[in-house]
């Protein structure tokens, strides 16, 4: 039985759960065959959130959570295989991003940590695993992020149209795809993470569905200006940012305490929009088509606000290009696993700032 398929697993900084996809790369164009979503239990979500900040006993907690994550990832793989009718021997590899708890590429000895006990995941699934995709790029002087632009280029580059692909997960980032074939990409700022945290705290809902709650508030312009004064927003690319920078803990340092929660939610949405729009207007020149993917793609109020900020440009979802916006990032890590197994570099130095193209990831054989 030929192992023709790849599985991609992504659990992003929003900490909502696990996206798993089954992909076929044998066709002329990559094909997303099936998908499966497994939400995180609330207790696991809170434990992972706590690991974003230094605390006593964090090494032990990180190791045990890595084991828990491997079991949840294996459960997601099992659900995906049952849904698709594919057997484990038909899968060449699992590309598992892991759960980011620290990302510090600018440190003297830069590092990044994505939790997952990969050997345990191999044992539980019987499938070869590729993980730790970011460390090699950082070792080569890069930011280790974003890594998805190489896949965006393979899927969406068009010699006749200047496109930008915007991923709005916990953090927002973009890939610039000019007509001349050069590619850049970088983090823009916050995505859904702070909005989700604020929404959960004040409404009890995990996220603000379609941005309806934010739409009831008004933007607090003074607060927005203070948040946008963070030096990160003025940094030129390549740049990347970690989840712990954009948190409600950071936000609370700017609040007076008498703000309407709905107004703060509206302001956080505009902060995400402003971060993205500034990057596109400042660094993506004459781009005419903007396509959004990630969880934020389903926030219709956010998309409408982004369209307003980028008037004169087409703003849509990657769905219209043939790839479901919800699954694109997991799809990318299936592709990155294949790149490594085939001995093909997975980074783009002009995106991450690395010294050159590098093979990304570590292979754990079955």
Curated annotation (Swiss-Prot):
<dbReference type="GO" id="GO:0005524">
    <property type="term" value="F:ATP binding"/>
</dbReference>
<comment type="similarity">
    <text>Belongs to the anhydro-N-acetylmuramic acid kinase family.</text>
</comment>
<dbReference type="GO" id="GO:0016301">
    <property type="term" value="F:kinase activity"/>
</dbReference>
<dbReference type="Pfam" id="PF03702">
    <property type="entry name" value="AnmK"/>
</dbReference>
<keyword id="KW-0418">Kinase</keyword>
<dbReference type="GO" id="GO:0009254">
    <property type="term" value="P:peptidoglycan turnover"/>
</dbReference>
<dbReference type="GO" id="GO:0006040">
    <property type="term" value="P:amino sugar metabolic process"/>
</dbReference>
<keyword id="KW-0067">ATP-binding</keyword>
<comment type="pathway">
    <text>Cell wall biogenesis; peptidoglycan recycling.</text>
</comment>
<comment type="pathway">
    <text>Amino-sugar metabolism; 1,6-anhydro-N-acetylmuramate degradation.</text>
</comment>
<dbReference type="GO" id="GO:0016773">
    <property type="term" value="F:phosphotransferase activity, alcohol group as acceptor"/>
</dbReference>
<keyword id="KW-0808">Transferase</keyword>
<keyword id="KW-0547">Nucleotide-binding</keyword>
<dbReference type="InterPro" id="IPR043129">
    <property type="entry name" value="ATPase_NBD"/>
</dbReference>
<feature type="binding site">
    <location>
        <begin position="12"/>
        <end position="19"/>
    </location>
    <ligand>
        <name>ATP</name>
    </ligand>
</feature>
<comment type="function">
    <text>Catalyzes the specific phosphorylation of 1,6-anhydro-N-acetylmuramic acid (anhMurNAc) with the simultaneous cleavage of the 1,6-anhydro ring, generating MurNAc-6-P. Is required for the utilization of anhMurNAc either imported from the medium or derived from its own cell wall murein, and thus plays a role in cell wall recycling.</text>
</comment>
<dbReference type="InterPro" id="IPR005338">
    <property type="entry name" value="Anhydro_N_Ac-Mur_kinase"/>
</dbReference>
<protein>
    <recommendedName>
        <fullName>Anhydro-N-acetylmuramic acid kinase</fullName>
        <ecNumber>2.7.1.170</ecNumber>
    </recommendedName>
</protein>
<keyword id="KW-0119">Carbohydrate metabolism</keyword>
<dbReference type="GO" id="GO:0097175">
    <property type="term" value="P:1,6-anhydro-N-acetyl-beta-muramic acid catabolic process"/>
</dbReference>
């Amino acid at each position: 039985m030929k192992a023709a398929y790849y599985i991609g697993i992504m659990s992003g900084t929003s900490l909502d759960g696990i996206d798993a996809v089954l992909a076929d790369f044998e066709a002329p164009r990559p094909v997303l065959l099936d998908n499966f979503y497994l939400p995180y239990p609330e207790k696991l979500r809170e434990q992972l959130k706590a690991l974003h900040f230094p605390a006593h006993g964090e090494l032990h907690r990180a190791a045990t959570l890595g084991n828990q994550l491997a079991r949840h990832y294996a459960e997601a793989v099992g659900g995906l295989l049952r849904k698709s009718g594919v057997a484990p021997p038909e899968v060449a590899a699992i590309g598992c991003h892991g759960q980011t708890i620290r990302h510090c590429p600018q440190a003297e000895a830069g590092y990044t940590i994505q939790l997952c006990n990969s050997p345990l995941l191999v044992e539980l699934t019987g499938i070869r695993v590729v993980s730790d995709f970011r460390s090699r790029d950082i070792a080569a002087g890069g930011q280790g992020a974003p890594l998805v632009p190489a896949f965006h280029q393979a899927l969406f580059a068009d010699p006749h149209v200047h496109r930008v692909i915007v991923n709005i997960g916990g953090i927002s980032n973009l890939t610039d795809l000019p007509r001349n074939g050069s590619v850049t990409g970088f983090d823009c700022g916050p995505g859904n993470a702070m909005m989700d945290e604020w929404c959960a705290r004040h409404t009890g809902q995990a996220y603000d569905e379609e941005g309806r709650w934010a739409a009831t508030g008004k933007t607090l312009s003074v607060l927005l200006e203070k948040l946008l004064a963070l030096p990160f927003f003025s940094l030129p690319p390549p740049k990347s940012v970690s989840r712990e920078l954009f948190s409600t803990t950071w936000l609370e340092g700017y609040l007076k305490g008498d703000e309407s929660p709905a107004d703060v939610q509206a302001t956080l949405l505009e902060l995400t929009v402003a971060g993205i729009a500034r990057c596109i207007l400042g660094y993506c020149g004459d781009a005419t088509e903007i396509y959004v993917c990630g969880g934020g793609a389903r926030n219709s109020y956010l998309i409408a606000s982004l369209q307003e900020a980028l008037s004169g440009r087409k703003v849509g979802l990657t769905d219209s290009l043939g790839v479901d916006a919800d699954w694109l990032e997991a799809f990318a890590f299936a592709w990155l696993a294949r790149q490594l197994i085939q001995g093909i570099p997975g980074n783009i130095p002009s995106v991450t700032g690395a010294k050159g193209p590098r093979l990304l990831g570590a292979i754990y054989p079955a």
